[in-house]
Amino acid sequence: MHNCGLLGKTLGHSFSKAFFENYFSENNITAVYSNFEISEIKEIESVFEQKISGLNVTIPYKELVIPFLDELSEEARQIGAVNVIQFKNGKKIGHNTDAYGFHQSIKPFLTNLHERALLLGTGGASKAVEFVFESIGLDVIHISRNPSGNKQYSYMDLNEHIRRF
């Protein structure tokens, strides 16, 4: 039996458990999907001690989980965020499927007329979105609660940047 789950801080709002339980049932897959709520990243070791096949990772651990992993896929390394952990041959391998999913979703709407993207947020998922935009040649501007770098602005600055956009 496969033991899979979602790793995050507050998971009551997540539909992942119900989605995967339904998927497993409809497809006759012998697996369990559990929510693994941890209040601090250091508690992850207790999750890893369980016999797990794979984990989805959500807020706020997509970046914080990386030091606890044995390997990263190339894309996860480039993005700097992990949303899937694969347990294989005794190793914990971090992957990022957010970038692929976002790229597949937005691809039909992009044209060569698009030059810039306004990205709200600077967390793990937004890093994957930024990776996609930059890989297709778009200039990315971030709006964040805590702007801390080049091309990062506060939500208070948003009106000014929208006018220039």
Enumerate the predicted regions with their spans.
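Rossmann-like adenosine-cofactor binding region
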Residues: 150-165
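Phosphate/diphosphate ligand-binding glycine-rich loop within oxidoreductases
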Residues: 2-109
